[in-house]
Amino acid sequence: TDQLHFAGFLAPQQVARQKQLAALMALRATVVLYESPKRLAALLADIETTGGAARPVAVCRELTKKFEDVQSGPVESLRAFYAETPARGEIVVLIGAGQEAKFDKSDLEAALDQIGVGYRR
């Protein structure tokens, strides 16, 4: 993507963090976050549950330093990796941009019928 959104550190509380992530998942931009090693597992779990499971994710550690490390892929595989290899140091997380939603008029009519609007032309 050609757009970046820098979000910095998200809230440490799970509910607040999930709300922030839900809003960030609506963006069509790569999201850049900071995270502490102690909260990385919780952040990755929340990314997965708030719509980021299909997005590419990169966990970058100790950028510009001797022990620089980048792990990328689906969030599910990153969760498994960091469950076995605890993160250390300064962490930057990148979440790839979401795909533009594609639907046609029949999809919209079906959704409106489901919520009881009864839209018809």
Region annotations inferred by a language model:
Residues 8-9, 32-35:
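Small/polar loops that bind or transfer phosphate-bearing groups
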